[in-house]
Amino acid sequence: MMKTNIGRRNFLKQSGATLFYGALITRAQTPPSERIRVAHVGTGGMGGAHINAFSAMPDVETVALCDVDSTRLAASAQRLVQRKPSAKPQTYADYRRILERKDIDVVTCATPDHWHALVAIHAFEAGKDVYGEKPLSYSLREGQRMEQTQRRTGAVFQLGTQIHAGDNYHRVAEIIQSGVLGKIGTVRLWKTGGSRGFGFPANQRPPDTLDWNMWLGPAPYAEYTPVRCHGTFRYFFDYSGGVFADFWCHIADILFMSLQPEGLTTIDARGEVPGDGIADTPKWIDADFAFKGLNVHWTTKPPPVPGADKMSIGAHFEGEKGTLTCDYETRKIRIGKEVLDDLPNVPVTLPRSPGHHRNFLDAVKSRGVPESNLPYVRKMTLPMHLALASFRLKRKITWDSVKEEVVGDPAA
């Protein structure tokens, strides 16, 4: 098999110039009354969810689907046509062919994580708006380049943190911002569980239906084994950052939505890899983040919070006057020991979302700013990248939040 490596560093050097599409920034000016033409890159789990959500919108036309796995691609096209007989999507194995089309307004990206930034930046350069998947980027520097390119091209971007649009997230932010808990000094975030090792499976010839070289793309070359692909790719640092990278943005979102923390100075992460297989992301990870006036703790174990042992994923805010615990799965809040649906005395101050996909489409039409916009989610994703660097280096990292540089540690 021919071994390829697009080269992540070379891509980042080139992406400030024209990339593949720098001369093509001729954004389709879709009048608000017309349909938005959407293409989907990645048709697996979340890709399928986005195909369903967008194709259900009356002002959306699904014109293209793309996947390096031809079996998944054919199945997703069939499901779309069964649900919506009027749909006539063209199918592609290479997303760059989609970006050559002048009639496409929006590209969704639900690829493995190591492709997120590349697809988005190429789409920005081609004059497309983008609905992306979490995590925002594979690396901190890629996130910076994404924001630079988006700003230059004027593209609209929304990250697919659908829970951000929920009334409960808005309500928690209103309660915290109301001051009823006093000044918040500590926030605890958690998602129990971590990576498995997956044993030591033998390498295989990739299925004829999978373009393994294209799947790898900018990642280091590796021989194919099923565990590296599709649903379990995220347990390899070549492609993602494990459970931590998968869930950080969902839980950190309520922190950033509520408090907008600034002035990150130190990041200290500890953890352990499984050791019983080829996967190398943490089976557990604890991380401490020092922001200006705020300490944030992440763990993959139940935190020292009353009732948290029954919550696999959540957030806990500790204020001068009280505490608030958010259960991500049941979407309940707990003030002290009392489980509540709401605090009726706290006024509604934040506008409610029409739904995450709808919020994005409305921004595409108005050229406005969606809720999970790129500057917001990049700032939210940055601590995750630094924590993974701290974990892999096995030492605390000092961060200059003004220059956005690690202080005194070139290896980071």
Predicted regions and their residues:
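Alpha-helix termination/capping residues and helix-transition junctions
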Residues: 57-59, 101, 178-181, 209, ...
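Structural recognition of the beta-strand scaffold that forms the well-ordered cores
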Residues: 37-40, 62-66, 108-109, 131-132, ...
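Hydrophobic residues in alpha-helical segments
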Residues: 55, 99, 150, 176, ...
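Glycine-/small-residue-rich active-site loops that bind phosphorylated ligands and cofactors
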Residues: 46, 115, 137-138, 164-165, ...
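N-terminal glycine-/serine-/threonine-rich beta1-alpha1-beta2 phosphate-ribose binding loop
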Residues: 2-132, 141-156
